[in-house]
UniProtKB/Swiss-Prot annotation:
Modifications the protein undergoes after translation, according to the UniProt entry: Contains 7 disulfide bonds. N-glycosylated.
Polar residues bias (residue ranges): 163-172
Top-level taxon: Eukaryota
Regions of compositional bias (Gly residues) in chain numbering: 78-104
GO biological process: chondroitin sulfate proteoglycan biosynthetic process; embryonic skeletal system development; glycosaminoglycan biosynthetic process; glycosaminoglycan metabolic process; heparan sulfate proteoglycan biosynthetic process; ossification involved in bone maturation; proteoglycan biosynthetic process
Primary role: Catalyzes the first step in the biosynthesis of chondroitin sulfate and dermatan sulfate proteoglycans, such as DCN. Transfers D-xylose from UDP-D-xylose to specific serine residues of the core protein. Required for normal embryonic and postnatal skeleton development, especially of the long bones. Required for normal maturation of chondrocytes during bone development, and normal onset of ossification.
Quaternary assembly: Monomer.
Impact when changing R754E: No effect on enzyme activity
Organism classification: Eukaryota, Metazoa, Chordata, Craniata, Vertebrata
Biological or metabolic pathway of the protein: Glycan metabolism; chondroitin sulfate biosynthesis; Glycan metabolism; heparan sulfate biosynthesis
Gene: XYLT1
Effect of mutating C276A: Strongly reduced enzyme activity
Name of the featured protein: Xylosyltransferase 1
Length: 959
């Protein structure tokens, strides 16, 4: 009886002890599991792919003294998002964001002399942006051997299999950031990224929410999704163009079929105009019903395989002009505003025995006016009475050539023998006599450059097995198609020399081959690169084909094949580079006959054009003016101010006022008003001015009232940007940085900013560029500081030993605060250099004087001074950048200013960054010491003999 309760108590105690032991064991297991999870998670995050989309290459190992401990958290911070680089092209540095969230630890670095303390940097680490190659662009293709005699002129990358050639759904650009991923638990982040990439691979055509790639939208009831396909899926709040919803897909007449192809659905959602969407629907349905593309085409060539005549180049053959020399019809297809370069090229190719037919792009009205003046000077020069808006890769270019051929054949007073197409970026590399002698010897031949690779690969690479449609100045990819049976498809370069017999055949023949090929190539990408080749190879004239277009093209695919045309073509393409002086030896080769070269661009390098011109025709007399100068118009009064942006209109007005102040201070004498002026109206014209291939500033032609006589005068002001790049003092031990600049419209191919002068406003998205010398791998820190010392962005860039250029566009919230910004570059947090750029306050909005509410909205900086989601405020004391309350208050008052107060603020900023170098009068002036523009060396009215066209010389030439 007594033993039983004791036994029960003992059992209860044992049970309690067992529970306690199990609890302790469970806690120990939980702790161990947590620590192991943290360790594996950190390892996984350190080795995982970067957020930002796309495949990321591993960074090259840096020297030990440059290595930095990377934070474990790979949050997709806005400061290191991977899609921002490039001058608007969306292909900037391959960025790897590491860190970026407040409170994340950052590895300490060894302190160096003069370095900022690393402890102060811990609360706000900089994201690391790894730039893998010299231009912030990583390519998986093997390096090419540069051959001076290579003339493979296809406009599509050689490694096209590795390139994403779709523009479906959200265009396949890397996302600037994925803020939702940064907030997810680390264990789910990789899974979400993997799922997102799989979805992108599967359904790039998922344009409509809830629709799979194979689902059908009923005709007549296709509303586009709320997000435009030209935008990212998650557009960051700093985005300038809100864009709104995609246009609703409406038709005048519903399509005659169900539009089910993902390419067509994507095109419908992205097309802007109702007419274009109607055309897309009709074209797709006709193709789907088998009514659009020919299935079989007749081959008329009697030869088996591909004919290729060999022609020999004999320098001695040009010593004797043939008895019946050929006469050439030059067809110049030009666009842009480089009228002086065009005139110089025209001067080099002109001969009274040839004919010149010029087509100017429908959008290039200034150039059209200049070309019309040229045509009035010479009877053998005519301008097409019709104009097309040709785009890269578009079917409109082939239409332009075919219509030009028809026009030339109908000109009975022009007895030409050869058709040669040129652009303003071409230049002859041999003389007219040499060209005529060669073509006279081979007058029955046709000269086209073939692709030189296997045909199946060429068809895939060129997209010939895809259906394209041009509308809204865009080439839309609508689906797949079959190559017609019965013919051999060929192609290569779209620059060619064709004899008259073949041009007549292509133009007037109604046989099965020509008729069906015109239909087939009306819906083809880059049709001029294949149409004439294919027709010639399958025609009765097939034995006249020479696999040489007599050109040298400067292909540098490492720089020129970055899919820079995806905003106008649903495909990936290339563009040749401009020639530089170091390329001159290529023009002297004699291995094969070549007579023209491209591309040349005077705003990039005019020296090479001069070298070639002097080589062909001799030097100009000593003392000839303007040989090292180049002027290019960017605005002309007949264009109308609607052709200008508010930023350029604002700054052009300020430049003109800067010139008038120079006239008053340097030309004015006390007691007289003869050199004092009051500005009147908008600028009349604006030119870029270059000297010795260096940008010298803008030339502003403007009207002003002379206060002494109250008469209107026309003046021209030269303004030059001040030097803003500055090496730190005392200089650091780091010597790789050569130059740094900020601007927009970065051209990664030519590695310069196309926005010459860096004219920026509050709604622009600037790009930071750095130029490097050779040296060891290093990591530098870049810091962007606004006019009131708010740190807008900071990030690190890994610079490889062979890097030459890097560029990055930080995703800043807009509007930017107007004023002078500073970009600092540090190495181990030791200042290396800095550069400045101006964000101009706008005096115009929609080309009208800005209203107070608009000014306050644009000029007060971003909401809550937050340029990014992350704050860098703690770096201000570390970088000795105090925020002055009085300066902030003055900025607030400036933001609310309008009228003369706003102009005064703007002009003070412009005067700090630009210098009025000189001013002149284009006509009569009451200012006795004012020089005449035509007598200066810098004015757009000064002599320019190299581009001026005069009377035909006795030898029939102009040059």
């Amino acid at each position: 009886m007594v033993a039983a309760p004791c036994a029960r108590r003992l059992a209860r105690r044992s049970h309690s002890a067992l529970l306690a032991a199990l609890t302790v064991l469970l806690l120990q297991t939980l702790v161990v599991w947590n620590f192991s999870s943290l360790d594996s998670g950190a390892g996984e995050r350190r080795g995982g792919a970067a957020v930002g989309g796309g495949e990321q290459p591993p960074p090259a190992p840096a020297p030990r003294r440059e290595r930095r401990d990377l934070p474990a958290e790979p949050a997709a911070a806005r400061g290191g998002g991977g899609g921002g680089g490039g001058g608007g092209g969306g292909r900037g540095p391959q960025a790897r964001a590491r860190g970026g969230g407040p409170g994340e630890p950052r590895g300490q670095q060894p302190a160096s002399r003069g370095a900022l303390p690393a402890r102060a940097l811990d609360p706000h680490p900089s994201p690391l942006i790894t730039l893998e190659t010299q231009d912030g662009y990583f390519s998986h293709r093997p390096k090419e051997k540069v051959r001076t005699d290579s003339n493979n002129e296809n406009s599509v990358p050689k490694d096209f299999e590795n390139v994403d050639n779709s523009n479906f759904a959200p265009r396949t650009q890397k996302q600037k950031h994925q803020p939702e991923l940064a907030k997810k638990p680390p264990s789910r982040q990789k899974e979400l990224l993997k799922r997102k990439l799989e979805q992108q691979e599967k359904g790039k055509g998922h344009t409509f929410p809830g629709k799979g790639p194979g689902e059908v939208l009923p005709p007549g009831d296709r509303a586009a999704a709320n997000s435009s396909h030209g935008k990212d899926v998650s557009r960051p709040p700093h985005a300038r163009k809100t864009g709104g919803s995609s246009p609703e897909t409406k038709y005048d007449q519903p399509p005659k079929c169900d539009i089910s192809g993902k390419e067509a659905i994507s095109a419908l959602s992205r097309a802007k105009s109702k007419h274009c969407r109607q055309e897309i629907g009709e074209t797709y349905c006709r193709h789907k019903l088998g009514l659009l593309m020919p299935e079989k085409v007749t081959r008329f060539c009697p030869l088996e395989g591909k004919a290729n005549k060999n022609v020999q180049w004999d320098e001695d053959s040009v010593e004797y002009m043939p008895a019946n020399p050929v006469r050439i019809a030059f067809v110049l297809v030009v666009h842009g505003r480089a009228s002086r370069q065009l005139q110089r090229m025209f001067k080099a190719i002109y001969h009274k025995d040839h004919f010149y037919y010029i087509h100017v792009d429908k959008r290039s009205n200034y150039l059209h006016r200049q070309v019309l003046q040229v045509s009035r000077q010479y009877s053998n020069v005519r301008v097409t009475p019709w104009r097309m808006a040709t785009i890269w890769g578009g079917a409109s270019l082939l239409s332009t050539y075919l219509q030009s051929m028809r026009d030339l054949l109908e000109m009975t007073d022009w007895p030409w023998d050869f058709f040669i197409n040129l652009s303003a970026a071409d230049y002859p590399i041999r003389t007219n006599d040499q060209l005529v002698a060669f073509l006279s010897r081979y007058r029955d031949m046709n000269f086209l450059k073939s692709h030189g690779r296997d045909n199946a690969r060429f068809i895939r690479k060129q997209g010939l097995d895809r259906l394209f449609l041009e509308c809204d100045a865009h080439m839309w990819r609508l689906g797949d198609r079959r190559i017609p049976e019965g013919i051999a498809v060929d192609g290569g370069s779209d620059w060619f020399l064709l004899n008259r017999r073949f041009v007549e055949y292509v133009t007037f023949s109604t046989d099965d081959l020509v008729t069906k090929m015109k239909q087939f190539y009306s819906y083809t990408l880059l049709p001029a690169e294949s149409f004439f080749h294919t027709v010639l190879e399958n025609s009765p004239h097939c034995d006249t084909m020479v696999d040489n277009n007599l050109r040298i093209t400067n292909w540098n695919r490492k720089l020129g094949c970055k899919c820079q045309y995806k905003h106008i073509v649903d495909w990936c393409g290339c563009s040749p580079n401009d020639f530089k002086p170091q390329d001159f030896h290529r023009f002297q080769q004699t291995a094969r006959p070549t007579f023209f070269a491209r591309k040349f661009e005077a705003v990039v390098n005019q020296e090479i054009i001069g070298q070639l011109d002097y080589y062909l025709y001799g030097n100009y007399p000593a003392g000839t003016p303007g040989l090292r100068s180049y002027w290019e118009n960017v605005y002309d009064e007949p264009d109308g101010i609607h052709s200008l942006s508010d930023v350029t209109l604002t700054l052009y007005h300020s430049f003109a006022r800067l010139g008038l102040r120079r006239a008053e201070t340097s030309l004015h004498t006390d007691g007289e008003n003869s050199c004092r002026y009051y500005p009147m109206g908008h600028p009349a014209s604006v030119h870029l001015y270059f000297l010795a291939d260096r940008f010298q500033g803008f030339l502003i032609k403007h009207h002003a009232t002379n206060l002494a006589v109250s008469k209107l005068e026309t003046l021209e002001t030269w303004v030059m940007p001040k030097k803003v790049f500055k090496i730190a003092s005392p200089p650091s031990d780091f010597g790789r940085l050569q130059f740094s600049e900020v601007g927009t419209d970065w051209d990664a191919k030519e590695r310069l900013f196309r926005n010459f002068g860096g004219l920026l406003g509050p709604m622009d998205e600037p790009v930071g560029m750095q130029k490097w010398g050779k040296g060891p791998n290093v990591t530098v820190t870049v810091i962007w500081v606004d006019p009131v010392n708010v740190i807008a962005a900071t990030y690190d860039i890994l610079i490889e030993s062979t890097a030459e250029f890097t560029h990055y566009k930080p995703p800043l919230n807009l509007p930017l605060r107007p004023g002078v910004w500073t970009v600092k570059i540090l190495h181990h947090w030791v200042p290396v250099a800095e550069t400045k750029f101006l964000v101009a306050p706008l005096t115009f909005s929609n080309r009208q004087p800005i209203k107070p509410e608009e000014a306050l909205k644009l000029h007060n900086g971003p909401l809550r001074n937050a340029y990014m989601e992350q704050s860098f405020q703690s770096l201000n004391p570390v970088l000795s950048l105090p925020i002055n309350p009085a300066q902030v208050e003055q900025a607030r008052r400036n933001a609310a200013s309008t009228g003369t107060a706003l102009e005064g603020w703007l002009d003070s900023l412009v005067g700090g960054m630009w210098t009025a170098m000189d001013i002149c009068a284009t006509g009569p002036t009451a200012c006795p010491v004012m020089q005449t523009c035509s007598q200066t060396a810098w004015s757009s009215f000064s002599p320019d003999p190299k581009s001026e066209l005069g009377a035909v010389k006795p030898d029939g030439r102009l040059r």
